[in-house]
């Protein structure tokens, strides 16, 4: 993905990205203080917001193969299982129940499979949101502060699963987190934002 001369005005705030390359199959981090424009950039990449100027070249990537996780997951009224398979129904896809059970067990949620999703703890909800994001095998996954305010065990499960995915069938990630150690441990490249602009990147 290549972003060139991107501009998006949001009242008194202006997002201006001269050049940004998101390499496929890599874990990219996006860092910066609150209010620097990270979420606006992510929503523009996802097509939720329309840019005022510039281009986002997806280089053949289908937006239907992209997904975005927020800090506070939105869960459906229904069971844990129903929440996981919801993205599959939207895309007319099928995954065997054995695969769903495997993911639930890996995330420590198999015992809660038939419980109402909204009865889960905050950490369990984030793990469920993560499983729902990966179940349809997207090519591009955005995580906007998904790892924030999580208990250490849940955070470790998610980060370990990200690493496992990258070892077997790499996808592209764009991860926003204020946790410096976790970001440095996970990411291949980190892009730093300030006042709506990319000011630096490290690999």
Label each PLM-derived region with a short phrase.
Residues 116-120:
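Conserved ABC ATPase signature
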Residues 130:
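Hydrophobic anchor residue at the start of the ABC signature
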Residues 46:
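Helix-to-loop junction immediately C-terminal to a conserved catalytic motif
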Residues 141-145:
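Catalytic Walker B motif of ABC-type/P-loop ATPase nucleotide-binding domains
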Residues 31-33:
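The feature captures the beta-strand-to-loop junction immediately N-terminal to the Walker
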Residues 78-92:
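Q-loop/switch helix immediately C-terminal to the Walker
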Residues 95-112:
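Conserved ABC ATPase "signature" region
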């Amino acid at each position: 993905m290549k972003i060139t001369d991107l501009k998006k005005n949001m009242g008194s705030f202006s997002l201006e990205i001269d050049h940004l390359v998101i390499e496929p199959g890599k874990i990219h981090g996006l860092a910066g203080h609150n209010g620097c424009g990270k979420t606006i950039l992510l929503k523009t990449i996802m097509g939720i917001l329309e840019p005022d100027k510039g281009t986002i070249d997806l280089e053949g990537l289908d937006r239907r193969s992209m997904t975005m996780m927020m800090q506070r997951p939105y869960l459906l009224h229904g069971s844990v299982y129903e929440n996981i398979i919801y993205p599959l129904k939207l895309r007319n896809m099928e995954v065997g129940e054995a695969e769903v059970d495997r993911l639930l067990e890996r995330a420590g949620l198999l015992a809660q499979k038939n419980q109402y999703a909204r009865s889960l703890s905050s950490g369990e909800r984030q793990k469920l949101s993560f499983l729902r994001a990966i179940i349809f095998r997207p090519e591009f996954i955005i995580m906007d502060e998904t790892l924030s305010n999580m208990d250490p065990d849940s955070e470790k499960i998610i980060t370990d699963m990200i690493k496992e995915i990258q070892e077997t069938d790499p996808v592209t990630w764009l991860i926003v987190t204020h946790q410096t150690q976790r970001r440095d441990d996970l990411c291949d490249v980190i892009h730093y934002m300030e006042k709506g602009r990319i000011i630096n990147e490290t690999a």
